[in-house]
């Protein structure tokens, strides 16, 4: 990379040095800026050709420079001869003006170091193009190195040279004397021009007589720059020292041979022995056959052979050569016509331009761009010719790249965009609008192209408006959206509303309908559809245009019309239009069809919406009912909780609610609340309830204060009382339970020895009861069974203080007393013998009359005892209807057998005091004194 940069730097430095050294100080530099070295030309390619511009007009030129350093090796007189020869050729060229001759724009200027003059812009010499790169900058420019001549360029170039020679021979009476590839210059447009008049010979006879051209003898001692190129020189010039116009035609033949033979001449001449070489050449020419001209096209081969004939009079003259069939190629004729265009009138030009589109595809792009395009754009100054020239220019633009279009064509189109007359100009532009919008830069589109379209819409000519409206949809997709929305659409609407032409109004509606797809939905709904209601006319074509826009918007997948718009604006507008009297049957059917489609969609969309709303309302109702149920359940649960709390405090000693049950209920409440959608007030209420429940759980269990009884004076233990109590208990165990009274609301309680178990706090055992039980009544560790009705109040006596209105819970909470008291099935009842109490007789004191224990035990039970003893054969707990048993073995319980008020059976209180038993009284007196 670095070596490449160094090489480039050295090249630029060298070129700059060459220019500086060659041109510096030359008067040409006062008026022209000299650019880079591009080519070489002239005799021996001695002239270096540079790009240049004129300082005053910035016009592009070519600067020819001869550096005197090239002839430093010569002696002074030889230098002078060379300089004089070069000056003579440039001066002669400057005096001659012809399209086929190189145009000199600034005459020759001489300085101490160089000779210089300026011409029209130049590409290269024909010798450079054919591969002779002498005196060219290094490296060779790719433009020259890769340059290949097209057939049409070759044909027309040779035709141009022939025309130039015809001008010299016929008009100027001059022989050029050195027609070579070095002296044929290709200008910037590709035209072939003649230069190098260093050895030209003018006729010595008056113009009306036969021209006579003096000829100088060949002097091999002269410098090569003072002699013509012998390889292209006619034989008679050397051998017979004569020259005439035919000598130039021989040179033309050798040039044609070189062009078709890659730049090589037909003969190579030994300059040291020129005469011998030409003699040998003369023999070869006399025997020249077609085999030697195989590289030359067949249609021109015979003419080249004639040009190379040894006899000058046989050679065709220049005028004859311009008319040979070889040059009748359509491309060459077209290029020739362009070169003579300035001589034609408008009618001839118009006819030529009309046929040009058929020829352009046959020509190479380089030829079109270099040769034809400049001629076409030069006609833009003639408004009458613009409609004929513009289609060809736009056709060329299609084949150009975007860069070429911007550089070569767009600057020329700028003034044409602003022309409104003739109207064909706008039509042509509108037809090619897609091309313009594709290749024109965005800034130029906004500044030049779209304003032309706007002017066409606002033009007073109805024809222009119609054409514009018809063409706009074809390129609407290329217009940027802001320009379309803010500039184009408003002008189309104005054209529709303000015109008096039905065609313009209809075309406006059709145009809008075609460009709807490039607009957004809300712009159409808010701007286009309301505009339709402003159209005043009711002609069928207008009404169908309105219907078309509605239908297009309604059915387009990108646009669409909302049901609100349909119901509120579209249908109220369309329905009255549908019954206009001007509409025929088909048009009416079209209206009705669109209206029905709109109604169907309106119905389906709104019905769907209402169905969805209905479903949502039903869901909301179900949620509201659920919330109400949740609230009622919450209130019920709260009431139950309150009742349970009341029972906790009112039923001390009863079956209390366990903590696990309350927790389960709280969890159930929480789950219900979670499942329901709660309002903020309900959530606040739930939070408060949770706080209260948490407080209740966190409180310590109620512990009644233990009152220690006042110590009483110790009394002597009465063993007799204790014994009697024990005996009564033992006796009750052997007695069967009597049958329960049907009228009693209490379940029968077993005999006196059966204990009923309650899981009560310990303070219940300390509580003084008024039902006849002692507060210090002992607990039993063994459980007994008893039938239980789970819905029965055990303690309904108003005298009961410690326990009130207790209702047992569900049956599974009842203990099972069955296992201890019910004998196995099938067991025989054994006859119980009286208990022998004689062993206890010694417990009585001697001071009292003795009554044996057996006598006491055999006394009949009184009426009180019958209340607590079940009759024989009465159902036991095993036959209880509930079938629910509570096993409380191992639990502490207090005995209720001593209190007959717990469960009286078959007992009726007499109205009077029970009669005292005399025997019993006597026995007690005997027992206790």
From Swiss-Prot:
Name of the featured protein: SCY1-like protein 2
Occurrences of domain Protein kinase (ranges): 32-327
PANTHER family listed in its UniProt record: SCY1-LIKE PROTEIN 2, SCY1-RELATED S/T PROTEIN KINASE-LIKE
Positions of the UniProt region annotated as Necessary for interaction with AP2 complex and clathrin, interaction with clathrin is necessary for its targeting to the TGN and endosomal membranes: 699-929
Biased composition (Polar residues): 912-922
Residue spans of the HEAT repeats: 443-479
Region described as Disordered: spans on this chain: 684-709, 906-929
Residue numbers of Phosphothreonine PTMs: 708
Chief location category: cytoplasm
Assigned protein family: Belongs to the protein kinase superfamily.
Chain intervals with Low complexity compositional bias: 695-705
Annotated keywords: Coiled coil, Cytoplasmic vesicle, Disease variant, Endosome, Golgi apparatus, Membrane, Phosphoprotein
Role this protein plays: Component of the AP2-containing clathrin coat that may regulate clathrin-dependent trafficking at plasma membrane, TGN and endosomal system. A possible serine/threonine-protein kinase toward the beta2-subunit of the plasma membrane adapter complex AP2 and other proteins in presence of poly-L-lysine has not been confirmed. By regulating the expression of excitatory receptors at synapses, plays an essential role in neuronal function and signaling and in brain development.
Compositional bias annotation for Basic and acidic residues: 684-694
ATP-binding as UniProt keyword: no
Disease: Arthrogryposis multiplex congenita 4, neurogenic, with agenesis of the corpus callosum: A form of arthrogryposis multiplex congenita, a developmental condition characterized by multiple joint contractures resulting from reduced or absent fetal movements. AMC4 is an autosomal recessive, severe form with onset in utero. Patients manifest little or no fetal movements, significant contractures affecting the upper and lower limbs, dysmorphic facial features, optic atrophy, limb fractures, profound global developmental delay, seizures, and peripheral neuropathy. Many patients die in early childhood.
């Amino acid at each position: 990379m670095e070596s490449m940069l160094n090489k480039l730097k050295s090249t630029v430095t060298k070129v700059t040095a060459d220019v500086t050294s060659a041109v510096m100080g030359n008067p040409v530099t006062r008026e022209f800026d000299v650019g880079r070295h591009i080519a070489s030309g002239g005799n021996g390619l001695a002239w270096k050709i540079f790009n240049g511009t004129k300082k005053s007009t910035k016009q592009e030129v070519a600067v020819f420079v001869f550096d005197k350093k090239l002839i430093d090796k010569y002696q002074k007189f030889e230098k002078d001869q060379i300089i004089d020869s070069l000056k003579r050729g440039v001066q002669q060229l400057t005096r001659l003006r012809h399209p086929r001759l190189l145009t000199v724009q600034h005459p020759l200027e001489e300085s101490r170091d160089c000779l210089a003059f300026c011409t029209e812009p130049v590409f290269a010499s024909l010798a450079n193009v054919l591969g002779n790169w002498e005196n060219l900058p290094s490296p060779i420019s790719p433009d020259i190195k890769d340059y290949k001549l097209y057939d049409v360029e070759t044909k027309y170039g040779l035709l141009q040279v022939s025309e130039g020679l015809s001008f010299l021979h016929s008009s100027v009476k001059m022989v050029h004397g050195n027609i070579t590839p070095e002296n044929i210059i290709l200008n910037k447009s590709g035209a072939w021009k003649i230069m190098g008049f260093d050895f030209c010979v003018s006729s010595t006879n008056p113009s009306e007589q036969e021209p006579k051209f003096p000829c100088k003898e060949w002097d091999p001692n002269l410098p090569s720059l003072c002699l013509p190129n012998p390889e292209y020189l006619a034989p008679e010039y050397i051998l017979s020292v004569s020259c005439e116009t035919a000598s130039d035609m021989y040179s033309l033949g050798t040039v044609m041979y070189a062009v078709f033979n890659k730049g090589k001449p037909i003969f190579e001449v030994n300059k040291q022995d020129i005469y011998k070489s030409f003699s040998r050449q003369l023999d070869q020419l006399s025997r020249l056959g077609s085999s030697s001209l195989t590289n030359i096209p067949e249609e021109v081969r015979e003419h080249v052979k004639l040009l190379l004939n040894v006899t000058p009079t046989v050679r065709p003259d220049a005028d004859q050569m311009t008319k040979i069939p070889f040059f009748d190629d359509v491309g060459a004729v077209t290029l020739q016509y362009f070169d003579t265009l300035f001589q034609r009138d408008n009618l001839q030009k118009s006819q030529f331009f009309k046929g040009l589109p058929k020829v352009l595809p046959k020509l190479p792009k380089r030829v079109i761009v270099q040769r034809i395009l400049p001629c076409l754009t030069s006609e833009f100054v003639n408004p009458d010719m613009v409609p004929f020239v513009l289609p060809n220019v736009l056709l060329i633009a299609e084949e150009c790249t975007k860069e070429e279009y911007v550089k070569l064509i767009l600057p020329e189109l700028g003034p044409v965009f602003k022309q409104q007359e003739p109207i064909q100009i706008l039509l042509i532009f509108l037809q090619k609008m897609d091309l313009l919008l594709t290749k024109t830069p965005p800034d130029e589109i906004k500044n030049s192209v779209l304003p032309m379209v706007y002017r066409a819409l606002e033009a007073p000519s109805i024809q222009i408006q119609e054409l514009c409206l018809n063409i706009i949809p074809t390129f609407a997709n290329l217009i940027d959206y802001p320009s379309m929305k803010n500039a184009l659409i408003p002008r189309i609407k104005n054209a529709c509303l303000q015109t008096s032409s039905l065609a313009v109004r209809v075309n406006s509606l059709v145009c809008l309908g075609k460009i709807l797809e490039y607009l957004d939905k809300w712009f159409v709904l808010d701007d286009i559809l309301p505009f339709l209601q402003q159209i005043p006319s009711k002609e069928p074509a207008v009404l169908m245009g309105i219907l078309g826009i509605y239908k297009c918007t309604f059915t387009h997948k990108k646009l669409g019309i909302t049901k609100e718009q349909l119901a509120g604006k579209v249908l109220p507008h369309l329905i009255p239009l549908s019954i206009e009297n001007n509409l025929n049957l088909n048009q009416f059917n079209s209206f009705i069809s669109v209206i029905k489609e709109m109604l169907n969609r309106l119905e389906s969309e709104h019905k769907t919406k209402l169905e969805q709303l209905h479903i949502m309302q039903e869901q909301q109702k179900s949620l509201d009912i659920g919330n109400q149920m949740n609230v009622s359940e919450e209130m019920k649960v709260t009431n139950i909780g309150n009742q349970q709390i009341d029972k906790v405090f009112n039923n001390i000693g009863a079956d209390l609610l366990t903590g696990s049950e309350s927790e389960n209920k709280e969890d159930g409440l929480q789950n219900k609340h979670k499942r329901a959608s709660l309002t903020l007030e309900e959530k606040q209420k739930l939070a408060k309830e949770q706080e209260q429940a948490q407080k209740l759980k966190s409180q310590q269990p109620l512990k009644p204060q233990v009152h220690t009884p006042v110590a009483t004076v110790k009394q002597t233990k009465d063993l007799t009382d204790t014994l009697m109590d024990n005996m009564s208990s033992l006796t009750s165990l052997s007695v069967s339970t009597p049958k329960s009274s049907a009228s009693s609301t209490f379940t029968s309680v077993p005999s006196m020895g059966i204990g009923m178990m309650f899981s009560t706090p310990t303070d219940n055992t300390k509580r003084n009861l008024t039902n006849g039980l002692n507060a210090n009544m002992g607990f039993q560790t063994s459980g007994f069974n008893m039938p239980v009705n789970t819905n029965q109040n055990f303690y309904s006596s108003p005298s009961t203080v410690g326990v009130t209105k207790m209702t047992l819970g569900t049956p599974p909470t009842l203990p099972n007393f069955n296992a201890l008291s019910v004998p196995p099935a099938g067991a025989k009842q054994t006859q119980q013998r009286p208990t022998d109490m004689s062993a206890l007789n010694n417990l009585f004191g001697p001071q009292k009359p003795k009554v044996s224990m057996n006598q006491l035990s055999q006394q009949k039970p009184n009426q009180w005892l019958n209340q607590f003893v079940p009759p024989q054969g009465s159902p036991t707990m095993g036959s209880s209807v509930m079938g629910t048993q509570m096993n409380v073995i191992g639990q502490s319980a207090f005995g209720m057998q001593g209190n007959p008020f717990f469960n009286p059976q078959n007992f009726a209180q007499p109205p009077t005091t029970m009669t005292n038993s005399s025997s019993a009284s006597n026995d007690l007196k005997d027992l206790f004194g």
